[in-house]
């Protein structure tokens, strides 16, 4: 009988044939050294290149790799949601295929998840470091978005969009079952839902490196992201979100912020 994975690691992908194979090998090499069972779920968000073919070849060699394929491009939020609802691990984490945050961060994240419902990587607080910065205009827009989302959603976290996040499995499934935003602002929505329902959000400072080959269209995606934040408030005000049940077996009511 196959063991239940200790962790399900999700990687959303869209047209990633040029860097997927190399970074997939890095992730598998890291996970293969672990004493626990794991699964690596690659979500192909309607790619038009050979992304799925690359994953299928890897999965034929490594049985712990799974491919989840969306027929058409729906957005990062929709891809992560699909992956979470398909995951079987005790813990669920996701990161970006560019590995802008080192895969080794998963070790600390899993430790922190012993006492927190949600752990998020942040690059804008004490203890974090940026090895290679984004262009100034992108950093500026990121700061504006963080302030805007914190004010509108009353969430108050240091950073929303760092790609590395982890959850206790049942918490992830509850939050992502409720989550509705398909695009880039899904991070803010999930953290809003977590805070709204009393789950602890632990901020872990990370070392981050900007990846030049981004698929973000700064003007289009900025406008859509700002609209999505208002949409989240609209959904909440008019009762579109289902009630997320609290987990009684752990006390996640007090926020814990890691300074490691």
Regions found by a protein language model. Give the residues of each.
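A conserved acidic beta->alpha catalytic loop
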Residues: 44-53, 99
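Short loop->beta transition adjacent to catalytic acidic/histidine clusters or analogous donor-positioning motifs
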Residues: 5-7, 28-41, 50, 63-66
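Acceptor/aglycone-binding surface of glycosyltransferases and processive sugar-polymer synthases
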Residues: 70-86, 91, 103-184, 211-220
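N-proximal low-complexity "stem/linker" segments adjacent to membrane-targeting elements
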Residues: 1-29, 36
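Acidic helix N-cap motif at the loop->helix transition within catalytic regions
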Residues: 18-22, 49-58
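Hydrophobic helical membrane-anchoring modules
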Residues: 1-6, 147, 154-155, 178-260
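Conserved donor nucleotide-binding strand/loop of the catalytic core
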Residues: 38, 52-86
């Amino acid at each position: 009988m196959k063991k239940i994975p200790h962790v399900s690691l999700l990687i959303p992908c869209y047209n990633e044939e040029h860097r997927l194979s190399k970074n997939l090998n890095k992730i598998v090499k890291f996970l293969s050294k672990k004493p626990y069972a794991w699964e690596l779920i690659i979500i192909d968000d309607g790619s038009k290149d050979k992304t799925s073919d690359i994953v299928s070849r890897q999965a034929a060699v490594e049985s712990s790799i799974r491919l989840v394929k969306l027929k058409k491009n729906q957005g990062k939020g929709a891809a992560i949601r699909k992956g979470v609802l398909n995951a079987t691990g005790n813990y669920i984490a996701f990161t970006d295929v560019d590995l802008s945050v080192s895969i080794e961060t998963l070790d600390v994240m899993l430790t922190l998840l012993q006492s927190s419902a949600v752990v998020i990587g942040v690059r804008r607080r004490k203890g974090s470091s940026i090895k290679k910065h984004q262009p100034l205009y992108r950093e500026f827009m990121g700061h504006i978005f963080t302030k805007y989302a914190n004010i509108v959603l009353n969430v108050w976290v240091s950073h929303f969009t760092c790609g590395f996040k982890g959850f206790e499995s049942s918490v992830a499934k509850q939050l992502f079952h409720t989550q509705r935003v398909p695009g880039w602002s899904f991070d803010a929505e999930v953290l809003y839902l977590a805070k709204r329902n009393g789950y602890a959000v632990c901020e872990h400072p990370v070392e981050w490196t900007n990846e030049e080959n981004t698929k973000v269209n700064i003007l289009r995606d900025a406008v859509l992201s700002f609209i999505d934040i208002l949409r989240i408030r609209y959904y909440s005000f008019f009762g579109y979100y289902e009630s997320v049940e609290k987990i009684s077996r752990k006390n996640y009511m007090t926020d814990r912020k890691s300074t490691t």
